[in-house]
Amino acid sequence: MSGGTGAGKTTFLNAMSDFIPKEERIITIEDNAELQIQGVENLVRLEAREANLEGEGAVTIRDLIKSALRMRPDRIIVGEVRGEETVDMISSAMLNGHSGSMSTGHANNPKDMLHRIETMMMMGIDLPLQAIQRQVASALDIIIHLGRIRDKTRKVLMIEEILGYEDGKIQTKTLYEFKEVGTENEKVKGSIMK
């Protein structure tokens, strides 16, 4: 999921988790526990930790992703990717049998999210951009973009499918996009359409 601050990414991620088969082993990884996944019997919650006053004892999102991979998860949910941990989420988790893994990130639209993922991966691994783009294109299926519109409501604004890597770039296709049709009682009217 992508979107700006306050777009509803975490809320939407919680809602999406309701559709995960309840028998799956799910591991959540967060900086601060915000996810509220319900009804899953085999749920493991991991939370990052800051270093103490002596600068020791830090546990990063990247550390937790590596640990989660040894816990035999069916899927991994990272509350938000912000930096080099994206390498482990993409390369180690999503490309190694943990399909259906999910995360959120800040971006203005799905294409910007792809560029942010590329940049975050470059922070954590020394690979050519083309190799990173191929990994991202192989790991991701869709990006759901959320946003706050002018009446302050939160909406799914776009669903973008990742088709693969071709002609030197990640190929995408817009599946659905929010179309505004007007206003009524100061509320924006519209729907998400193909």
Residue ranges and their predicted role:
Residues 135, 152-194:
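NTP-binding/hydrolysis catalytic cores, primarily Walker-type P-loop NTPases
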Residues 14, 18-66, 113-117:
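P-loop NTPase switch/communication element
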Residues 1:
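Hydrophobic anchor at the beta1->P-loop junction of P-loop NTPases
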Residues 6:
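Walker A (P-loop) phosphate-binding loop of P-loop NTPases
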Residues 60, 128-129, 193:
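General structural signal for secondary-structure boundaries
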Residues 23, 120-123, 178, 182:
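Hydrophobic alpha-helical segments
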Residues 30, 37-40, 68-167:
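Conserved P-loop NTPase nucleotide-binding/switch module
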Residues 9:
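Conserved lysine of the Walker
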